[in-house]
Amino acid sequence: MNSMDRHIQQTNDRLQCIKQHLQNPANFHNAATELLDWCGDPRAFQRPFEQSLMGCLTVVSRVAAQQGFDLDLGYRLLAVCAANRDKFTPKSAALLSSWCEELGRLLLLRHQKSRQSDPPGKLPMQPPLSSMSSMKPTLSHSDGSFPYDSVPWQQNTNQPPGSLSVVTTVWGVTNTSQSQVLGNPMANANNPMNPGGNPMASGMTTSNPGLNSPQFAGQQQQFSAKAGPAQPYIQQSMYGRPNYPGSGGFGASYPGGPNAPAGMGIPPHTRPPADFTQPAAAAAAAAVAAAAATATATATATVAALQETQNKDINQYGPMGPTQAYNSQFMNQPGPRGPASMGGSMNPASMAAGMTPSGMSGPPMGMNQPRPPGISPFGTHGQRMPQQTYPGPRPQSLPIQNIKRPYPGEPNYGNQQYGPNSQFPTQPGQYPAPNPPRPLTSPNYPGQRMPSQPSSGQYPPPTVNMGQYYKPEQFNGQNNTFSGSSYSNYSQGNVNRPPRPVPVANYPHSPVPGNPTPPMTPGSSIPPYLSPSQDVKPPFPPDIKPNMSALPPPPANHNDELRLTFPVRDGVVLEPFRLEHNLAVSNHVFHLRPTVHQTLMWRSDLELQFKCYHHEDRQMNTNWPASVQVSVNATPLTIERGDNKTSHKPLHLKHVCQPGRNTIQITVTACCCSHLFVLQLVHRPSVRSVLQGLLKKRLLPAEHCITKIKRNFSSVAASSGNTTLNGEDGVEQTAIKVSLKCPITFRRIQLPARGHDCKHVQCFDLESYLQLNCERGTWRCPVCNKTALLEGLEVDQYMWGILNAIQHSEFEEVTIDPTCSWRPVPIKSDLHIKDDPDGIPSKRFKTMSPSQMIMPNVMEMIAALGPGPSPYPLPPPPGGTNSNDYSSQGNNYQGHGNFDFPHGNPGGTSMNDFMHGPPQLSHPPDMPNNMAALEKPLSHPMQETMPHAGSSDQPHPSIQQGLHVPHPSSQSGPPLHHSGAPPPPPSQPPRQPPQAAPSSHPHSDLTFNPSSALEGQAGAQGASDMPEPSLDLLPELTNPDELLSYLDPPDLPSNSNDDLLSLFENN
């Protein structure tokens, strides 16, 4: 049997032992804590251990909620494993998800109140002074009770998994329980559980008296301190954690380094070598360590990796020391480590530097004294280390690979010395002398048991800024804010980024990003399980990571621009559903294909909208009962309810979604069976982009406007006899007075528009109209109250020309005669004064005939609207997707000028890529296609009722519209060129109405029953006629992976039958 087989066998034997202990309430906590530590390393989830691990987890899922066991700890354990479900077989992964959700539900019910009582500002790792004192060793040596005491640097058991504990940093796991590296046998190399012979483990055994202290030895005997002799449970270390730079005393894994004789921060002499246990196993582990080093370096820690990749800040810390390279999240120590004296060189730099002997063996160097590059000023005072260094040759340099940045819970490990305070230049390789030496307790571990250190419940402010190695945000909560002044090594250039607030306090205890956790009401002081910054929810780094530093994820400029909301055809992901009566917590799962997730992240105009509405509201206006709280993937979301029931806003989830499985957890304190919930894909173009699209596609040429006005004159004369258009009695209608003020804002119209079916000449301001319909759009003309859906709007070039001609004057009205000649009506103080044609006014303002007018330059106007789609040089406003965007150059996503996409148009995909239909209009497919598609009249009467449907609130109805028209905005669709194309706007959702598109094709597929939209979740119930549930399938998309293809109804029906929903993996 080779060493690896032996290691596997020993590990499985240990797991079997833990399984037995998990069934006993007296040993459950210790056993679960050890297992949680072990699961902190991704290697724990290798197939050779799966069967044994699942046996343990099966027991946890069964007993955790029983009396005498620890539900919170059991949930965290399952959550950590569930976050790595991709490493399990499908069957095991399904069991994990189910267990995790079940325990999460029970945990919420049991601890909801208590969680909210935690003070919000409390740092996760700050134990109260009293607790620190209680941590005093009960054994003969100071570390006696270490293993299970809640040491300052350990996480409290009741701490949400979101907060990372010290032990977590290297392995990238959040060990939320009080697991300690030292106390935890898992850190002991002797322990078979060290997969791959944890690099740390090796020096820990024989050479490190500190680790092998009786306590460790005792691991084989029984839990020291806490576990009385009567307790047989043996806690063995499973995966020791690698050293933390500069953490001078973490026994095995920290600066003291596994090898450090006094690894626990206790003088070596206090721990007799006699304590060494299983030297042979240790040796084997050490041997494996070298082999595992490579794997370790590249391994990705569940949480840590996510954090890292998410912000990409820490891809690597620049070389900290001449020899230091941080490559992976695990510090791989290359080979067996001999006893490294606890000497001050544990800091990363020193480790990398090779731990010069002088630094190692001599007494700790003063902070101000120069020291060899490799020696860390704090070397000696690592956590819990006595201030002196114990001489001990440091066998070799331990390159620290990639030190993970600390999480909020673990403020700083080593490296404290580098910071502005420490005078270490931020430059990577050098750490000039820092401040005067002082016993550095590692700020992070309050109350460390360092002899010289006062045990304060808090993390003493580090003298140095760790900024350069750690993200400042992590230290937000602490008084010592690390300015992060220099991540000098931060390759990412995050360097002086102001610390992001650590939302820690608001995150409910949620063990793993992907797992639903009982949502604590936002505001609870529980730190997020995963990340200090709510950045990352997805447990696995998505292809494209949205950077969501703020709870509401909106894209960067998301708040800068107003957006319209239109449901996308066949875009219902979770059909409208009710909650079970009196069910306090319910989980609703949906899946996103990686390609769909990527597209959502790329396009700022696409969103996953989750809303609640009253079951009797046909318009499906958003209405959230006061008792409802929503959490997605364990991230609580804030619901905007506004001042009244008409101002409620739907939730947008894409920023908290992840590829694959996603869980929406709804918590209610009172029954809300009268409401329905629906999750759907919506198109949210910015008002600006819609304006640009309308200008390009729905500009009614002056000659058409004139024809329409003349027709109105004749029809009015015929229908109302001698009544003028304005309703005035007169001989014969010789002129019409038209106000230049918008009936919505009562200000001068900037861009005159009216609905396609409107018979009046009076216009309203297009931008004001779009803004009016942003939230709960009714899409009704403010002049005649007829339905004026987005696709049916027309920009009147003739009126626009009049406005331009007198833009610098203060006229409020103009008169237009039957020949369409016009002149301004002077503002009269005396109403009795007639507007005599021969009078001064007439002389000053001549009547202008259409032929004399200079029409406005549409392209200039479009460009003036700002970042337009590619067609125009200006990039569209980030927040909005200009129709241009879509149209942008026809198909180019124009760099997403309007999108918030961080990457711009991802992959350079052109809009075309997304749209199947050929762009019919001059503007690429966007509008035109959709519009055209839209154009085809929808058959559903509902649409009329739903004109607003276009609005976000009426997603379904709008969906209808949106469906066919999925991107009205993107299409700017209304702009379809067919000015005359009679739209069936009323029936069609706003976007489809006019489009002459019909002419282009009457996609019947576009039609889709609003109700169906409502219910048809993936829709595809298919029949647009079906009352509610059915959604029309999209015309076949040639490439179902092109999420957007479904968005724009193609000009030509495609032959593929994929519905949008097909893009979403349903359970």
UniProtKB/Swiss-Prot annotation:
Q: Which species expresses this protein natively?
A: Homo sapiens
Q: What is the effect of changing residue 300 to M?
A: In NEDDFSA; leads to altered positioning of pyramidal neurons; decreased transcription coactivator activity; does not affect nuclear localization
- Zn-finger (SP-RING-type) residues: 727-808
Coarsely, its chief localization is nucleus
Region annotation Disordered: residue ranges? 112-141, 327-542, 868-1067
Q: How does it assemble?
A: Interacts with AR, but not with ESR1, NR3C1, PGR, THRB nor VDR. Interacts with NOTCH1 and RBPJ. Interacts with SMARCA4. Interacts (via SP-RING-type domain) with SMAD3 and SMAD4 (via MH2 domain).
- Where in the sequence does UniProt note compositional bias of the Low complexity kind? 128-141, 479-497, 1040-1067
**Which tissues show it?**
Expressed most abundantly in ovary and, at lower levels, in prostate, spleen and testis. Weak expression, if any, in thymus, small intestine, colon and peripheral blood leukocytes.
> PROSITE patterns in the record, alphabetically?
ZF_SP_RING
Comment, domains: The SP-RING-type domain mediates interaction with SMAD3 and SMAD4.
Q: What is this protein called?
A: Zinc finger MIZ domain-containing protein 1
Effect of changing residue 287 to T: reported as: In NEDDFSA; uncertain significance
Alphabetically ordered keywords of this record: Activator, Cytoplasm, Disease variant, Intellectual disability, Isopeptide bond, Metal-binding, Nucleus, Transcription, Transcription regulation, Ubl conjugation, Zinc, Zinc-finger
Positions of region (Sufficient for transactivation activity): 1-120
The superkingdom of the source organism is Eukaryota
Q: Where is this region: Transactivation domain?
A: 837-1067
Listed InterPro entries: Zmiz1_N (IPR040797), Znf_MIZ (IPR004181), Znf_RING/FYVE/PHD (IPR013083)
What gene makes this protein? Answer: ZMIZ1
Residues that coordinate or bind Zn(2+)? 758, 760, 781, 784
**Ranges of Pro residues compositional bias?**
431-440, 510-521, 868-879, 981-996
Give the location in the cell: Nucleus, Nucleoplasm; Cytoplasm; Nucleus
User: Per the record, where are the segments of Polar residues compositional bias?
Assistant: 413-429, 881-895, 951-961
Task: Give cross-link positions for Glycyl lysine isopeptide (Lys-Gly) (interchain with G-Cter in SUMO2).
Answer: 91, 834, 843
Linked pathology is: Neurodevelopmental disorder with dysmorphic facies and distal skeletal anomalies: An autosomal dominant disorder characterized by intellectual disability, developmental delay, poor language acquisition, behavioral abnormalities, growth failure, feeding difficulties, microcephaly, facial dysmorphism, and mild skeletal anomalies of the hands and feet.
Function per UniProt: Acts as a transcriptional coactivator. Increases ligand-dependent transcriptional activity of AR and promotes AR sumoylation. The stimulation of AR activity is dependent upon sumoylation. Also functions as a transcriptional coactivator in the TGF-beta signaling pathway by increasing the activity of the SMAD3/SMAD4 transcriptional complex. Involved in transcriptional activation of a subset of NOTCH1 target genes including MYC. Involved in thymocyte and T cell development. Involved in the regulation of postmitotic positioning of pyramidal neurons in the developing cerebral cortex.
Pfam families per the UniProt record, alphabetical:
zf-MIZ (PF02891), Zmiz1_N (PF18028)
